[in-house]
From Swiss-Prot:
This is UPF0313 protein Ppro_0556. Binds 1 [4Fe-4S] cluster. The cluster is coordinated with 3 cysteines and an exchangeable S-adenosyl-L-methionine. Residues 594-623 are annotated as: Disordered. Belongs to the UPF0313 family. Keywords: 4Fe-4S, Iron, Iron-sulfur, Metal-binding, S-adenosyl-L-methionine. GO terms for molecular function: 4 iron, 4 sulfur cluster binding; catalytic activity; iron ion binding. It comes from Pelobacter propionicus (strain DSM 2379 / NBRC 103807 / OttBd1).
């Protein structure tokens, strides 16, 4: 099967003079289901549509956007697998100098606010052709949202981009129905109420059975109204009971239909059976780091019911787990093993959270009226069926393939869930670690983990004890590398000191700490901007200055010479100078240097891996 056309000559080789849908993408074109635009393009192609891809066009002129001509139906624009601002800037708002989704890892192949810029250029090139926007950037900016890089509330991206329709979430259903209806002659302006979409109406337009949340103007001027808008919208994310949401922007209305229904197992299997080339487009002469990272990985499912407050998965993929069948996964492994570059190691079998594969709610009636954002917090839902047999069978099958030497589970596990999955836990420790297990407690102080919607210290200690005991029993020299966040809303300098002392007591040391980044669409970002917990209304302490955020981070890195001055300053502020000798010595440690991925809950190589790069060889991550 050939690549999706990217040039006129590739179109002509297929005998095509015009395409039905043209995708414009901020990432390089890698024909693999781990990348959203190629997945949707192949999905439409399967259903008889002629599609093309314009990857990373030069936005400084209009000509690159005209490369494939005028589509018969519409353009579909996406910033790529990450929000373009997250991709371009560090948590300190400093410009990055690399881009894993670009050949040669080069920065600068897409603009800031790429969805907005692409839409503007497409409208300039073909004013009368509809432009549909989607992807993580559009999804998480679909309502009025706080923008960290401008430190203000911005309008829905649909208004700023002046697009015709916004598709949010995993868009296979909405994209296909839109193309089919337009293909039958319907005007996009007449297609309203399609699940998983947002559109604009004039004020006064009559809508039934909807929820109106505080308007853009209120959100921009009143932080409590912003928190209220977030709280109301986040409770409508269950596709079975979510209502249409309306948010006024001046004299117009943003209308957001309920989320798309989840895919059934057979539909998931059919997606991953599409004829992908499983390679970057041959026009690229340099390697694409994101492709190198995932080319030996397998997506087993999508969705996550953890509901971490700093993570965007729930607002994008949803909390309902959509799993592939084992035979579908086995078919992909069989294909992978035949690749000439495959060397025997599968780098990952998983999703956003690997040990959620095959899990579901045990009460369909309860599920369809549920408004919980997490099935695990504040305590595990009594309706959740936690059965690890299906996941264990999948891992066994993967290891048994001829030509497979090792299977990693590097997309992360929830260690609180592992307490009810003893067989899976044993499998993980015995066969799928290979040296270091990266775990993501994010914090260990209860008042902070509660705000993060994460398990607390006691749960982590039980997991750590079990991991060490099982590793010793197996004679495996395995260790733990903890992932931690500094500067999270509600976290004070004293909390970070308490965390640092807990790590010392547990014999753990970190080499990288993630400074909290307020990314659009998350609960933690709402906390950061509003200064309150949107669920309880409790006022929160929020570290906003670069100085304090730097001090929080330094308290966990006292063994590094470059952080010594900041550690001493932090201890002086807390009146705890006597702890200097404790924090400024290396101490016992299981950890080695492990670079943390540069986003929390935003970067996505594919449906199922929200954190993308920097995992050392032979390492896995647990949440």
């Amino acid at each position: 099967m050939a690549f999706i056309p990217t040039t006129r000559s590739e179109m002509h080789r297929r005998g095509w003079e015009q395409l039905d849908v043209i995708f414009v993408n901020g990432d390089a074109y890698v024909d693999h289901p781990a990348f959203g635009v190629p997945l949707l393009a192949r999905w439409l192609e399967k259903h008889g549509f002629r599609v093309g891809v314009i990857a990373q066009p030069d936005w400084r002129s209009v000509e690159p956007f005209m490369a494939l001509g005028r589509p018969r139906l519409f353009f579909a624009a996406s910033a790529g697998a990450m929000d373009s601002m997250v991709a371009h800037y560090t948590p300190a708002r400093k410009l990055r100098h690399d881009d894993a989704y670009t050949p040669g890892n080069r920065h600068g192949a897409r603009p800031n606010r790429a969805t907005l810029i692409y839409t503007s250029r497409l409208k300039e090139a073909f004013r009368d052709v509809p432009v549909v926007i989607g992807g993580i950037e559009a999804s998480l900016r679909r309502f009025a949202h706080y923008d960290y890089w401008e430190n203000r509330v911005r309008r829905s991206l649909l208004f700023d981009a002046k697009a015709d329709l916004l598709l949010y979430g995993m868009a296979e259903r909405s994209m296909l129905e839109l193309a089919q209806r337009m293909g039958r002659g319907e005007s996009l302006a007449d297609i309203r109420g399609l699940r998983g979409t947002c559109w604009v109406e004039k004020a006064g337009h009559h809508l039934t059975d909807h929820l109106e949340i505080p308007c853009f103007e209120e959100c921009g001027s009143d932080r409590l109204k912003f928190a209220e808008a977030f709280r109301l919208a986040s409770r409508e994310q269950n596709p079975y009971n979510g209502r249409t949401i309306v948010q006024r922007h001046g004299d117009r209305l943003l209308v957001c239909a309920p989320p798309s229904l989840p895919l059934e197992e057979a539909e998931m299997d059919s997606l991953y059976a599409l004829p992908f080339e499983k390679a970057p487009h041959p026009s690229y002469g340099e390697t694409i780091p994101a492709w190198e990272q995932i080319r030996c990985s397998i997506t087993s499912h999508r969705g996550c019911f953890g509901g971490c407050s700093f993570c965007a998965i729930a607002m994008h993929q949803g909390k309902l787990i959509q799993s592939r069948g084992q035979s579908s996964v086995e078919s992909e492994i069989r294909e992978l093993v035949r690749k000439p570059w495959f060397r025997g190691s599968i780098s990952d079998i998983g999703g956003p959270t690997a040990n959620m594969y095959g899990l579901s709610c045990g009460d369909s009636a309860a599920m369809k009226c549920c408004r919980r954002e997490s099935c695990l917090f504040p305590k595990q839902c009594r309706h959740l069926i936690v059965d690890d047999r299906r996941a264990v069978r999948l891992l066994h099958a993967a290891r048994d393939f001829a030509g497979v030497r090792h299977v990693a589970v590097s997309s992360g596990v929830r260690y609180d869930l592992l307490e009810r999955q003893p067989a899976y836990c044993r499998e993980l420790i015995a066969h799928h670690v290979g040296g270091l297990l990266k775990v993501a407690p994010e914090h260990l102080v209860e008042r902070v983990t509660m705000l993060m919607r994460k398990p607390g210290l006691a749960v982590f200690e039980r997991f750590l004890s079990r991991f060490r005991e099982e590793s010793r029993r197996l004679g495996k020299p395995q260790g733990i590398v903890p992932y931690l966040i500094s500067g999270h809303p509600g976290c004070s300098l004293a909390d970070m000191l308490e965390l640092a002392l807990a790590l010392q007591r547990l014999g753990l040391r970190v080499e990288q700490v993630q400074d909290f980044t307020p990314t659009p669409g998350t609960c933690a970002t709402c906390m950061y901007y509003s200064g309150i917990d949107p669920e309880t209304g409790e006022k929160l302490y929020v570290a906003t200055s670069d100085r304090e955020k730097g001090l929080q981070k330094a308290l966990l890195l006292g063994h590094l010479p470059g952080e010594r001055k900041k550690v001493l300053e932090a201890l002086a502020l807390l009146g705890r100078e006597e702890l200097a000798t404790v924090l400024l010595t290396a101490g016992r440690s299981e950890a080695v240097s492990a670079k943390r991925p540069h986003s929390v809950g935003q970067g996505v190589i594919h449906p199922g891996r929200e954190r993308k790069a920097g995992r050392g060889k032979g390492t896995k991550k647990a949440r």
